[in-house]
Amino acid sequence: MKITLGVAVAALAIGGLHYYKNADSKVQNIEETEEVAKVNPVGPSFNADSAYAFTKAQCDFGPRDMNSRGHDLCGEWIVSKFMEYGCKVTTQTATLAGYDGTKLRSRNIMASINPEATTRILLCAHWDSRPWADNDPDSANWRKPILAANDAASGVAVMLELARIIRKSKDEKAFNKQLGIDFVCFDAEDWGTPQWADVADNADSWALGAQYWSKNLPQGYEARYGILLDMVGGVGAKFYREGMSMQYAPEIV
């Protein structure tokens, strides 16, 4: 995907979504090294195999590019899984215009845990797939849709796994009822201008669902902070402290 829109993004960490905080809550210059930080996760364990299975399940629908049957079926599956894990699910539908004027049937999926809680955390990812493999080394594939296991079935899979383990924590009465969590699956993210198009790339042609959501928030909605999960399933992936997050939420990062 092409990141063009910040939606309350704080930080992304590997696996269990661990957060780091300086003792004095001040920004420090950190030298990037190859060393992996050792942390002690708090709370239920994140199951990587389960997240992998959720990723595969999405890919089994085939490409999830806009207006396709695979896209529609996968959307229904995502809704059913969040409901299975006790989330209150709402959808936000709209007809959006692609870079070339194509009408896109967009569906943002919002799943909430403890919807009555006023202190809320936002986690988000996009669930549509890129309709063109315009970065493929083989130009013969440039106009073919991609399966998109990493970009971005992996992000939705992480959210589903978190919903699953939080549901287990709630069943065991170990979850803070004063805290609400919102999972938002953005649609129409990756219909941005392809490299082979005869028009200039327009940043606003990307992240259409996120743009629509940010302009049509539920009345009174406010999240304390948010985490964007994008392309988190790559082999040997490394995630660094992101600049915008360090600027706006250093105490969380």
Predicted regions and their residues:
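Hydrophobic membrane-insertion alpha-helices, especially the h-region
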Residues: 4-16
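Sec/Tat-exported extracytoplasmic proteins
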Residues: 59-66, 82-86, 113, 131, ...
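Acidic/histidine-rich catalytic neighborhood of metal-dependent amide-processing enzymes
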Residues: 143-251
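Acidic/histidine-rich, surface-exposed loop or edge segments in extracytoplasmic proteins
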Residues: 34-39, 52-64, 142, 236-237
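Solvent-exposed loop/turn segments at secondary-structure junctions
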Residues: 65-66, 95-98, 115-117, 127-131, ...
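Solvent-exposed, acidic/flexible segments
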Residues: 44-51, 64-75, 102-104, 148-156, ...
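A non-catalytic alpha/beta surface segment that caps or lines the substrate-entry region
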Residues: 53-116
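Sec-dependent signal peptide cleavage junction
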Residues: 20-49
